[in-house]
């Protein structure tokens, strides 16, 4: 009799779910999290040209976080300009869209940081011989999204390295626009997150070549409402869980982001 009871207890223990991460009551009730995304930044988030479905590192990370939390991720496509207003007004619970954690944004949102990243110069491969090192960029036209922190970082780098011959910054509507202007010869070089370049170089073989290394350290974060402390902690716990069980590293490797991973989740590490 005792042996049978013990066996039953062991089976029940084996089948019991892992300790659940505590969710805010409203999230626990609706069993979903509304997440804003701007799918135009491969490999972070984009629409698969063959299927028109959302894909990318952020999409797969978001779905993995949802499984850890036991909720559905309800993706809400929007423009970049509307992401912060959406989190402020509560139209979405989170933003997971390759967003840089900046101190200037932390009054509006709290960031759970999941990548260590930074801007990197690149040029057309056909002009690689002109740009053997980054100092060759001095005096040249360099394009980057005006909505990011890249303009500030480019100006800082130029001030330090281009005495009397500064980079001529050209603001673009986004990274895709910067690449278009690069191909058209309207800019000599472009800047975007270094984590995105390996994917782009695979997507368009022979098109681009990086110049130098990442020239500033940034963190990419999942943005949440400043007052949503319980959800912030839940996301931290879920991300740490993915890091611990190896799922996070698997996703990094799949999307060629291994060199940009973090060892643990942090909050508002951006400057």
Q: Where in the sequence are the language-model features?
A:
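Periplasmic-binding protein-like
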Residues: 39, 116-123, 201-240, 257-271
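Acidic, polar ligand-binding/catalytic clefts
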Residues: 63, 67, 72-136
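Ligand-binding cleft/hinge of the Venus flytrap
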Residues: 47-48, 63-69, 150-171, 201-205
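A ligand-binding cleft/hinge motif common to bilobed small-molecule-binding domains
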Residues: 81-85, 98-106, 153-156, 181-183, ...
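Extended ligand-binding regions for polar small-molecule ligands
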Residues: 59-68, 127-128, 135-149, 221-260
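Ligand-binding clefts/hinges and TM-proximal coupling segments of bilobed small-molecule sensing domains
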Residues: 21-23, 149-169, 210, 240-271
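Short glycine-rich His-centered loop
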Residues: 30-55
